[in-house]
Curated annotation (Swiss-Prot):
Pfam families: Glucosamine_iso (PF01182). It comes from Nostoc sp. (strain PCC 7120 / SAG 25.82 / UTEX 2576). Its EC number is 3.1.1.31. Keywords: Heterocyst, Hydrolase. This is 6-phosphogluconolactonase. The gene is pgl. Hydrolysis of 6-phosphogluconolactone to 6-phosphogluconate. GO terms for biological process: carbohydrate metabolic process; heterocyst development; pentose-phosphate shunt. Belongs to the glucosamine/galactosamine-6-phosphate isomerase family. 6-phosphogluconolactonase subfamily.
Amino acid sequence: MKKTVEVLPDQTALIARSLDLILTKLDTAIKQQGRFTIALSGGSTPKPLYEAIAAQKLPWDKIHVFWGDERYVSPDHPDSNELMARTAWLDRVDIPAENIHAVPTLDNNPAVSAAKYEQHLQTFFNSAPGEFPALDVVLLGMGDDAHTASLFPHTEALQVRDRLITVGNKDGNPRITFTYPFINAASSVIFVVAGANKRPALAQVFAPSADDLAYPSRFIQPQGELLWLLDAAAGAELSV
């Protein structure tokens, strides 16, 4: 694993650096394999990043978009990660509908939806059960409790090591999420983290030793490249 940590002066610089990295990796992937695969994160931090991507002139037919996690709500619900990404980016560009690989959330059974999304991924990547295909980029955020995707502290989702997708849980509300072994299979994992409220969690995530189950972002140790992009408010006290 190659680990890089960058602290940017403010959120504007954070988004600009994130955009630059993604565009570089997109260009390389399309040149090498004819397509680019990316898993998106939710939350408020990446919205301006998605808006910036939408402003680019890109080969949209070669870009495939997935979600690292999704709240178990309808796609038009205000809390939907899919809706946020569509509003900020996907509905603004000429990307083929079949290139948007949204999480199914209308089965009234999160386990069924998780299995459907896993099957979809296996079909797309032509991977067998038990194999962990590699996305080009998995984009992640981190909460002030050190959760990432919908992998929350001391939850059952952290115990799942033989699946691509599982059911996460936040305050009794189910979510669909990548498992940490699937995230770790990615060619590049990019954390984009902003805000002073993240400092205590970051200190534990970067500590030489800590309780991984209490700070789930510690589980993210990809086979490929790990990039932490932080704004100054988040990274000011970090010793890296």
